[in-house]
């Protein structure tokens, strides 16, 4: 039985294998076909069936082999299919437009609006309009005033239907076409679009087609066509309403464009996605119709509908959520189960409580009861998501509760301790709270309470509130006042802080013999109003504040305040005024780094509304140094709260530890306000007074130093002649005595009276009066480059013969900016860039018993001799002309920083220099000043900045012209000044003057560019030669590769044959030998090389010719970077060399 069953299973398996061999059985009845396998299995021999199965298996293997072979063939040479897909598959479809379509055109102007009367009116937000205006700025208006462009129209008070509201300039390019269609394919297409978008069967009566083609912006150059804007508005008028179809073909730029619908009530409007943003370009790529760039809208009476019932979203691609239904899912469900049909809004189980009617949208009157809110609550009507009114109650600010039952006050001061500033006081009131800064602090009380003008005094000791009250205060730390140590002070209500006994408290300060401080001495009556408080404090904040004030004004950062006595007069009056004065006086004790005990008084006036003849001052024990404050004793004393002596309005600071008081912090400041400095610079006198001329004395021969570039001349007064040590920047003249000793004795015997020209070393050369010192503090500001002052020395008259007569004795040139000084040795400061030089030149003075050469002889007898001496001196100075320096002008590159440079030349350059000044008879002080002017030219380029334009393609945005100032710096040539003493001039060498340097400048201006151009030409020629050589080598190499095949090139050799040199004939023999080997014939298929087979890095047995891929069999081997130079590398080759 098991054998029979096995036999039946094999028969069934054979039946499945032979289904393709018995096609004739398909025509037999189905029942016979099921019985036939069983019958055949019982009648036929199983061995024959097994043999048939083996044959069928062989056939199946053969079919599989052929199928695999077919796939391999397809893999070796696949069929290339090129598919070009453009995304998106659909694009916006503009209606036909232009003159060929029968359109009319707007004029080529700016802000154009064309009036058009329609056949059928447009329904827009519940109103019908038969007259519209076609606007060039990308909209359809319903009013004549809508043609003017203005931004922010959504929302606004003007009715618009705007596909793309933008400022277009038709004068710059672009056209606007429009036409009204009442029949034809346009109406049919509009009808089908409406039916597809809203599932409504409507009949289109007319259509208005408006096309804005290639719009250009305003105030810019014309953009390329791909950057222009092209869009269309198709308005379909039906019996069931108006539909608007916006079609965007190309959006290339925007200037804040907007798209949408505006009802004109400044509230109701509809904006397209990305309207008013730079992303408005995406209107071309998206749409709510399923086609990019096409948007369809239904203009109903109340609002604009974008999607059909059951759909919502900007692009109408979302279904309504639970509880929503209708177009744009704008309606809410009022069903008992909470959900309704998304299209019709039907409720399967009925409406919810208080709702009935179609789709449960009617609210019952019994549910419309008004709710009574609690006290301190606000009742208002709110709207839910569906726009339905809901009455709500809410507690007012400062109260908590539900608003319907109760609203309790919130105590913010208890619930939040940090709600006010730490220096403020919190006060709670019903529904509110207040933060008030403490006394002595000012601010909003919540975020800021900084220390006020006056120091805090609300906790200080107060004087009795009566007239003429006093208080004696014993100091915890004694104060040094007016040179004496004080331990007790008396404070009176009349505004006095006295050190001595106060005998009377009325009259004037000068009559009271008072020693102390009077911040505001007046008829103050505390019994009427105000208060006076006193306290000695050591608070850190107070001391830090006064320390900073004193350190900043007295230039002593080491001063530290240790204690302060604070006396405050708060809102004090004389009994007749309604508004009182408030001021404060601080006596500050401290010391500096030298442990010097210092005391200051700081008077601070906040409010001084009344005066009544009051006085203010500091009365020292030395009456001559007492200080009365400005306007003391007058009605103008109220100005103390606005003025100051430390540049802080209302604050006056004085140092009082010494008997001699100083009205200002610095001795060079001008009292009483100390807001400017004393002028110590002399004013140049217009002429020398007669009494001053008599005291003038000519200086003795000596050395005159070349001054440093600080615009200061410091003449040296020298008595007698001597040896002068020569140094750098010192012009030294060696002179012999004017007369011998015998001549001096002879001339001294003459008794005729004569003027005395002698002088003492301590007497100044020039005497100036007080009015000559009237220069401002900025008189010494250097506004030009430094200059060099050359002062030649005097020569004795017997140095050279042949003199020129001079009948007039010139006076020295006193063109200086600082007072003259007398000194035996003068230090000459040098600039950092100059070379090292002796700081001063020692000068030997004449002995006191030696007589000056100018004192010998009488006036009458020496008149002729004196003139001869002057002529001799003049002629002696003539000998220095060959040694006088010269100012050389060297053109320098333009200095963009605007700073002129002073360059010092060497001694060799000084030999060719000449001085341009003339020497005088006795002493000539000549100043040569050369200024390098810097001219700054400022040019303003007016530009008109166009509005910002967003261009959405690769076209670059036009650049706005810059409105910044352009500065052209014109720099004069720098001055080269000699810095070394001149040597003996060589007459054979030519003199180089300024004119010659100017002649050289044009030549250099031409020569330098020519040399630069020649250098560049040489570089270019070299580069061209290198490039040509490389191209020639590459061309020859390519010819060889074409002749000998792809295998031509550098070939690696085995290590064994490394030292053996082979020839071209050896390669030919090897090629002939290899060509006769049949084992390698398959590998040589398709080769064009004459050198045999390609070499491989692996044995030949691993690479069967039949299994090589196309790339392996056809691509030449790579000879790049295979380590050919490494002698230790060994290769295995498929070929035999």
Swiss-Prot record:
Residues 738-765, 795-856, 878-897, 906-933, 978-998, 1106-1125 are annotated as: Disordered. Residues 906-915 have a biased composition (Acidic residues). GO terms for cellular component: dendrite membrane; extracellular space. Residues 1-41 form the signal peptide. Residues 43-1005 are extracellular. One of its GO terms (biological process) is cell-matrix adhesion. It is a single-pass type I membrane protein. Residues 916-933 have a biased composition (Low complexity). Pfam families: EGF_3, NIDO. InterPro entries: EGF-like_Ca-bd_dom, EGF-like_dom, EGF-type_Asp/Asn_hydroxyl_site, EGF_Ca-bd_CS, EGF_dom, Epithelial_Barrier/Signaling, NIDO_dom. Along with dyf-7, enables neurite growth and maintenance by anchoring amphid dendritic tips during neuron cell body migration in embryonic and larval development. Promotes seam cell remodeling during the dauer phase. Plays a role in positively regulating locomotion during the dauer phase. This is Dendrite extension defective protein 1. The gene is dex-1.
């Amino acid at each position: 039985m098991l054998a029979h069953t096995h036999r039946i299973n094999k028969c069934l398996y054979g039946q499945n294998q032979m289904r393709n061999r018995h096609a004739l059985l398909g025509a037999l009845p189905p029942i016979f076909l099921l019985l036939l396998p069983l019958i055949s299995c019982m009648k036929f021999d199983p061995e024959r069936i097994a043999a048939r199965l083996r044959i069928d298996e062989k056939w199946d293997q053969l079919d599989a082999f052929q199928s695999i072979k077919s796939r391999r063939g397809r893999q070796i040479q696949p069929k290339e299919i090129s598919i070009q897909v453009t995304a998106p598959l659909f694009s916006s479809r503009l209606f036909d437009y232009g003159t060929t379509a029968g359109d009319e055109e707007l004029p080529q102007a700016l802000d154009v609006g064309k009036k058009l009367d329609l056949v059928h009116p447009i329904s827009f937000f519940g109103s019908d309009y038969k007259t519209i205006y076609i606007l060039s700025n990308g909209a359809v208006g319903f009013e004549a005033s809508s043609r003017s462009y203005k931004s922010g129209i959504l929302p606004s008070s003007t009715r618009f239907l705007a596909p793309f509201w933008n400022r277009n300039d038709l004068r710059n390019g672009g056209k606007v076409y429009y036409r009204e269609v009442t029949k034809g394919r346009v109406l049919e297409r509009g009808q089908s679009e409406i039916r597809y978008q809203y599932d409504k069967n409507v009949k289109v009566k007319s259509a208005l087609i408006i096309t804005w083609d290639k719009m250009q912006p305003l105030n810019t150059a014309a953009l390329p066509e791909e950057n222009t804007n092209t869009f269309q508005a198709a308005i379909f008028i039906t019996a069931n309403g108006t539909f608007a179809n916006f079609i965007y073909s190309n959006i290339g730029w925007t200037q804040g464009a907007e798209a949408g619908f505006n009802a004109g009530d400044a509230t109701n409007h509809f904006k397209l996605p990305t309207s008013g943003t730079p992303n408005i370009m995406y209107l071309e790529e998206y749409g709510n119709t399923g086609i990019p760039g096409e948007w369809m809208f239904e203009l109903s009476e109340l609002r604009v509908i974008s999607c059909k019932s059951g759909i919502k979203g900007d692009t109408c691609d979302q279904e309504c959520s639970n509880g929503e239904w209708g177009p744009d899912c704008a309606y809410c469900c009022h069903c008992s189960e909470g959900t309704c049909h998304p299209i019709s809004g039907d409720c399967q189980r009925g409406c919810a409580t208080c709702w009935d009617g179609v789709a449960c949208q009617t609210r019952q009157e019994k549910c419309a009861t008004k709710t009574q809110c609690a006290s301190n609550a606000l009742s208002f009507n709110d709207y839910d998501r569906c726009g339905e009114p809901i009455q709500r109650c809410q507690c007012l600010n400062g109260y908590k509760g539900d608003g319907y039952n109760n609203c309790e006050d919130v105590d913010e001061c208890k619930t939040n301790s940090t709600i006010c500033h730490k220096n403020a006081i919190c006060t709670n009131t019903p529904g509110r709270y207040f933060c008030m800064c403490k006394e002595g602090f000012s601010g909003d009380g919540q975020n800021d309470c900084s220390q006020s003008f006056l120091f805090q005094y609300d906790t200080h000791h107060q004087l009795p509130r009566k007239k003429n009250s006093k208080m004696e205060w014993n100091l915890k730390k004694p104060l040094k006042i007016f040179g004496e140590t004080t331990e007790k002070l008396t404070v009176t209500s009349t505004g006095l802080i006295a050190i001595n006994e106060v005998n009377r408290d009325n009259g004037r300060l000068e009559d009271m013999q008072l020693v102390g401080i009077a911040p505001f001495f007046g008829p103050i009556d505390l019994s009427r109003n105000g208060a006076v408080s006193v306290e000695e404090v050591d608070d850190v904040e107070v001391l830090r504040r006064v320390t900073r004030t004193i350190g900043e004004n007295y230039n002593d950062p080491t001063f530290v305040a240790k204690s302060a006595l604070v006396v405050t007069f708060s809102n004090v009056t004389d009994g007749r005024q309604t508004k009182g004065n408030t001021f404060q006086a601080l006596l500050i004790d401290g010391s500096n780094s030298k442990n010097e005990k210092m005391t200051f008084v700081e008077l601070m006036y906040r409010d001084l509304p009344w005066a009544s003849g009051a006085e203010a001052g500091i009365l020292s024990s030395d009456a001559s140094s007492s200080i009365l404050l400005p306007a003391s004793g007058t009605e103008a004393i109220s100005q103390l709260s606005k003025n100051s002596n430390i540049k802080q309005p209302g604050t006056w600071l004085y140092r009082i530890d010494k008997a001699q008081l100083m009205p200002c912090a610095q001795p060079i400041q001008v009292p009483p306000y100390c807001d400017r400095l004393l002028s110590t610079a002399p004013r140049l006198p217009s002429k020398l007074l007669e009494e001053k001329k008599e005291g003038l004395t000519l200086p003795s021969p000596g050395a005159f130093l070349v001054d440093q570039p600080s615009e200061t001349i410091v003449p040296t007064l020298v008595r007698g002649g001597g040896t002068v040590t020569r140094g750098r920047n010192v012009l030294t003249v060696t002179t012999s005595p004017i007369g011998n000793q015998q001549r001096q004795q002879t001339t001294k015997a003459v008794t005729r009276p004569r003027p005395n020209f002698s002088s003492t070393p301590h007497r100044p050369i020039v005497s100036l009066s007080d009015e000559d010192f009237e220069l401002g503090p900025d008189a010494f500001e250097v506004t030009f480059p430094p200059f060099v002052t050359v002062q030649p020395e005097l020569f004795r008259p017997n140095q050279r013969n042949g003199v020129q007569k001079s009948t007039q004795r010139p006076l020295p040139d006193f063109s200086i900016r600082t007072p003259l000084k007398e000194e035996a040795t003068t230090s000459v400061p040098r600039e950092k860039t100059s070379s090292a030089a002796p700081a001063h030149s020692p000068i030997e003075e004449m002995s006191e018993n030696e007589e000056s050469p100018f004192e010998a002889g009488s006036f009458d007898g020496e008149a002729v001799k004196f003139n001869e001496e002057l002529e001799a001196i003049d002629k002696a100075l003539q000998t220095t002309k060959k040694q006088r320096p010269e100012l050389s002008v060297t053109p320098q590159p333009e200095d963009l920083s605007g700073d002129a440079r002073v360059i010092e030349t060497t001694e060799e350059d000084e030999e060719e220099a000449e001085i341009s000044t003339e020497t005088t008879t006795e002493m000539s002080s000549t100043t040569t000043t050369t200024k390098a002017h810097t001219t700054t030219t400022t040019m303003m380029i007016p530009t008109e900045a166009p509005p910002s334009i967003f261009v959405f393609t690769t076209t670059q945005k036009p650049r706005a012209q810059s409105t910044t100032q352009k500065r052209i710096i014109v720099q004069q040539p720098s001055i080269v000044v000699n810095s070394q003493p001149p040597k003996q001039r060589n007459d054979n060498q030519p003199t180089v003057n300024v004119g010659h340097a100017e002649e050289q400048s044009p030549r250099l201006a031409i020569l330098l560019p020519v040399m630069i151009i020649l250098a560049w030409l040489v570089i270019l020629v070299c580069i061209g030669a290198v490039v040509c050589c490389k191209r020639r080598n590459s061309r020859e190499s390519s010819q060889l590769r074409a002749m000998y095949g792809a295998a031509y090139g550098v070939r690696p050799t085995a290590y064994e044959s490394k030292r053996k040199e082979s020839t071209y004939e050896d390669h030919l023999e090897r090629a002939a030998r290899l060509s006769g080997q049949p084992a390698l014939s398959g590998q040589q298929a398709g080769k064009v090389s004459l050198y045999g087979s390609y070499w491989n890095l692996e044995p030949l047995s691993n690479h069967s010719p039949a299994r090589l891929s196309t790339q392996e069999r056809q691509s030449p081997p790579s000879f790049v970077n295979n380590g050919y130079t490494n002698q230790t590398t060994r290769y295995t080759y498929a070929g035999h060399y």
